[in-house]
Amino acid sequence: GKVEDRIDSKFVIPKSALVGDATDLFDFIAQSVKKMMTENAPEDMEKRVPLGFTFSFPVDQKAVNKGLLIKWTKGFSTKNVEGNDVVELLQASLRRVRVNVNIVALCNDTVGTLVARYFVDTDVQVGVIIGTGSNACYFERASAVTKDPAVSARGNAVTPINMECGNFDSKYKYALPITVYDEEMDAITPNHEHQRQEKLVSGMYLGEIARRIIVHLAQLGCLPRELVDGLCKPWMFESKHMGM
């Protein structure tokens, strides 16, 4: 179908939800959904509204509306989520805040970009995300997916494969060109020695890598020291400043 109208709302996840308990994070998301609906579609508050849940983390997806978080990435360390069904956690929070929303589908963000584009261009083969994190997916022949007999039984049909390629080089180190700045930055992340490829190219980390390079150049005398007086603390320089 065609989307006739689209309304966007943005919400900043509080630090307490990034490091707190599952209820802190998913209750915040549920409250944000409720706020958006109240402001933009109050007439739908009494209806049973279907919701698609894009979740850009490694998931063991058991069904279209069921997926277990394998491991947090991108600075998240919220407790009691890894190994649990993220759809069930969000659905419980939606019930707690009393918003009549039913999660009908769970989707990785790369798969979402690929499938959405496929509606208008059937030649598309790859979906890529380079934002806070980094990942890619592609269409594969179902018969080649031997890991899941139910999928491989579909023969020549195609199915999207979420690569989770941001984790490339985490097991076999140094296939990628890692610098001392990358190593120093990786050492202070919650998922040390994981998501190595993602940490080289994505917005969550580029600002910190740039900050370390700038500080080092100032220490060598290549830049005036007063230029870096406000950059001595990790994560003080965000990636968005690099585009100014």
Q: Which positions does each model-derived feature cover?
A:
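Short beta-strand-to-turn element immediately C-terminal to the catalytic PLP-Schiff-base lysine
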Residues: 137-141
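ATP-binding/phosphotransfer module of carbohydrate and carboxylate kinases, centering on a glycine-rich
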Residues: 1-52, 95, 119-120, 178-244
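Glycine-rich phosphate-binding loop and adjoining helix at the ATP-binding site
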Residues: 5-30, 34, 59-118, 123-126, ...
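Short loop/turn motifs enriched for small/polar and acidic residues
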Residues: 54-58
